[in-house]
């Protein structure tokens, strides 16, 4: 039953609500400005600035939340505002959002500010937005009809497709000229015809394209859909810089699984200029219907909204399930305590209070490693994480062995409280949540020969792509990598991660005498950040089946020269080309267009 006041009588309540919305509006204005600048940097080929903008943007949200919280504390003594006034603040805020174009994001911002100011006993729908209050359906950009969420094009026939795609590209008004747009458009049309074969053109045949480009790494993506009769097909066209410095259309992606990988949790967030983000999410859900809205918001750079929606989905799942949280199967980690809910496809990771030898680390250092991954280009090889504080779980849903494990390994991270319904709850003070994957060591142990070979190929590619992106995993054991549902190998254990350019690539010195040669111990000096690729054989090639596949595909991983060549290119300022789609789909490989850009791996990337 609602306990909201019947009258909105407080001027302070309105002023606080207005201040909070002003804070959000400032945040989103800056967010959009970065997205607009991404187009300028892409046109100029200024990849280092693009990377820096991507990193900086991640901090925008928390900066505005802190800034707004300080204003409320200083000007309104927010922590001492009475409960009834806080309820009026929420109602005033809802009123201010009536015609807002980003109401769902503004509600999440309200929650973020409140959770900084209020005790967690206030984290219910009377005071914050546990459920959304404003609908995002059918929000239209009436102020700028020339910039709709998406544009519709009508080819009319197969013959009209070339002109249609040329108009699509021109409408993005890219300043950098194309190398040969007519040639590239011809490749797009040919790719469409080869994919669909002899399909009948329906009267409603049309192409819808989102009005903003999607920028990530060194690529700008055109994202759309093809509608014909009662079928809808995804469409993605990557635009890249050619060797001449001019632009080219690199491929046309028409398979649902190919578009899914573009929005995978293993990739960095896109930079997209969106007036109405909910409309973009609705469009993207149409071409990726099984993709959770939380993941789509996150991939668009709106990770706080994604985090909010994920938590709502999680609470909904808890309400409609009855299985218990258990300790995650597999080899126990030295730093993290990992648990899972079997019916839910995620794992929960809590930093332990104590770390046995040989681990030398701290809680703050581990958290900084996870933040590094959040800000860095994940190139499809590192899992994104959701970070939460003070999460309350029903104690009755926790397996007794798991509770004992938490009390033993992470006592400072848990506490108990009485829930609103009177039931006992266990509160986890800090937790990371990641998509659950099959640990690579288990995949290699239990897989067929074909699966094992695929796993080793993917593992080697993952290592090479990570170091090309300036990431050294630290602990390269197979147990620290997972296999996604589509068979891609992804790194997910970050407590020893570091920038590859901070590492010293070394060869193992020649032994100076027989005693050193026969020694079972390391007899040479090892300094911090030293890596010896030749020694990786010891812990990677123990299984004869693995050894055979590994040496067939990735023997160069044991060659210090390969590692040093990557480091030298990074130090020279080179930004590698990473393709979030199989390189076999590139027009240079399909139709023989002049080549440009060398992928890190020497064969087609698989979809994750």
Curated annotation (Swiss-Prot):
Q: Which InterPro entries match?
A: AceK_kinase (IPR046855), AceK_regulatory (IPR046854), Isocitrate_DH_AceK (IPR010452)
What's the protein here called?
Answer: Isocitrate dehydrogenase kinase/phosphatase
Q: Enumerate the UniProt keywords alphabetically.
A: ATP-binding, Cytoplasm, Glyoxylate bypass, Hydrolase, Kinase, Nucleotide-binding, Protein phosphatase, Serine/threonine-protein kinase, Transferase, Tricarboxylic acid cycle
One GO biological process term: glucose metabolic process
Sequence similarity: Belongs to the AceK family.
Organism expressing this protein natively: Cupriavidus pinatubonensis (strain JMP 134 / LMG 1197) (Cupriavidus necator (strain JMP 134))
- Its domain of life reads Bacteria
Instruction: Give the location in the cell.
Output: Cytoplasm
One GO molecular function term of this record is: ATP binding
Q: Where does the UniProt entry say this protein principally localizes?
A: cytoplasm
Active site (catalytic residues): 384
Binding, ATP: 328-334, 349
Sum up the protein's function in the record's words: Bifunctional enzyme which can phosphorylate or dephosphorylate isocitrate dehydrogenase (IDH) on a specific serine residue. This is a regulatory mechanism which enables bacteria to bypass the Krebs cycle via the glyoxylate shunt in response to the source of carbon. When bacteria are grown on glucose, IDH is fully active and unphosphorylated, but when grown on acetate or ethanol, the activity of IDH declines drastically concomitant with its phosphorylation.
Task: Report the GO terms under cellular component.
Answer: cytoplasm
EC nos: 2.7.11.5, 3.1.3.-
On whether Cytoplasm is a keyword of this UniProt record, the answer is yes
Q: Which reaction does it catalyse?
A: L-seryl-[isocitrate dehydrogenase] + ATP = O-phospho-L-seryl-[isocitrate dehydrogenase] + ADP + H(+)
């Amino acid at each position: 039953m609602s306990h909201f006041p019947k009258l909105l009588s407080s001027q302070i309540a309105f002023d606080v609500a207005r201040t909070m919305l002003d804070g959000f509006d400032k945040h989103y204005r800056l967010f959009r400005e970065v997205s607009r600048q991404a187009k300028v940097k892409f046109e100029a080929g200024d990849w280092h600035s693009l990377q820096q903008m991507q990193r900086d943007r991640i901090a925008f949200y928390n900066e505005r939340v802190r800034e707004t919280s300080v204003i409320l504390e200083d000007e309104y003594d927010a922590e001492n505002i009475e409960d009834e006034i806080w309820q009026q603040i929420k109602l005033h805020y809802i009123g201010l959002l009536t015609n807002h174009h980003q109401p769902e994001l503004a509600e999440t911002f309200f929650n973020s500010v409140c959770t900084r100011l209020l005790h967690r006993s206030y984290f219910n729908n009377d005071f914050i937005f546990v459920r959304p209050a404003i609908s995002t359906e059918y929000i239209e950009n009436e102020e700028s009809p020339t910039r709709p969420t998406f544009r519709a094009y009508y080819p009319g026939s197969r013959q009209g497709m070339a002109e249609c795609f040329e108009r699509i590209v021109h409408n993005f008004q890219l300043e950098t000229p194309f190398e040969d747009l007519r040639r590239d458009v011809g490749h797009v049309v040919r790719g469409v015809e080869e994919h669909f074969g002899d399909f009948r053109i329906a009267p409603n045949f049309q192409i819808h394209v989102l009005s903003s480009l999607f920028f990530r790494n060194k690529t700008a993506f055109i994202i759309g859909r093809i509608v014909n009769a009662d079928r809808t097909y995804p469409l993605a066209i990557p635009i890249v810089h050619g060797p001449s410095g001019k632009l080219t259309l690199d491929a046309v992606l028409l398979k649902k699984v190919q578009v899914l990988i573009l929005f995978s949790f293993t990739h960095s967030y896109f930079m997209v200029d969106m007036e109405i983000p909910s409309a973009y999410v609705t469009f993207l859900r149409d071409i990726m219907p099984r993709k959770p809205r939380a993941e789509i918001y996150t991939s668009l750079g709106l990770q706080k909204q994604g985090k909010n929606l994920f938590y709502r989905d999680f609470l909904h799942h808890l309400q409609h399930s009855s299985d218990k949280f258990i300790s995650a199967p597999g080899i126990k980690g030295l730093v993290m305590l990992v648990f899972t809910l079997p019916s839910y496809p995620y794992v929960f990771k809590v930093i332990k209070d104590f770390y046995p030898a040989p681990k030398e680390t701290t809680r703050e250092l581990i958290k900084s490693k996870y933040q590094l991954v959040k800000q860095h280009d994940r190139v499809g090889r590192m899992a994104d994480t959701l970070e939460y504080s003070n999460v309350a779980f029903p104690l009755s849903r926790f397996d007794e062995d798991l509770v004992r494990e938490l009390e033993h390994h992470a006592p400072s991270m848990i506490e108990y409280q009485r829930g609103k319904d009177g039931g006992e709850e266990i509160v986890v003070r800090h937790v990371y949540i990641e998509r659950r994957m099959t640990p690579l060591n288990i995949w290699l142990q239990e897989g067929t020969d074909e699966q094992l070979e695929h796993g080793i190929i993917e593992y080697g590619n993952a290592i090479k792509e990570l170091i090309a992106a300036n990431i050294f995993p630290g602990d390269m054991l197979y147990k620290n990598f997972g296999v996604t549902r589509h068979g891609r190998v992804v790194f997910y254990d970050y407590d020893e991660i570091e920038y590859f350019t901070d590492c010293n690539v070394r060869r193992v010195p020649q032994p100076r005498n027989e005693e050193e040669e026969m020694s079972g111990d390391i007899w040479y000096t090892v300094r911090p950040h030293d890596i010896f690729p030749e020694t990786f054989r010891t812990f990677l090639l123990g299984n004869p089946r693995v050894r055979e596949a590994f040496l067939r595909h990735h023997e160069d991983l044991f060659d210090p020269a390969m590692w040093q060549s990557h480091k030298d290119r990074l130090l020279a300022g080179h930004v590698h080309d990473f393709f979030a789609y199989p390189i076999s789909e590139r027009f240079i490989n399909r139709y023989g267009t002049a080549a440009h850009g060398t992928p890190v791996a020497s064969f087609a990337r698989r979809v994750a």
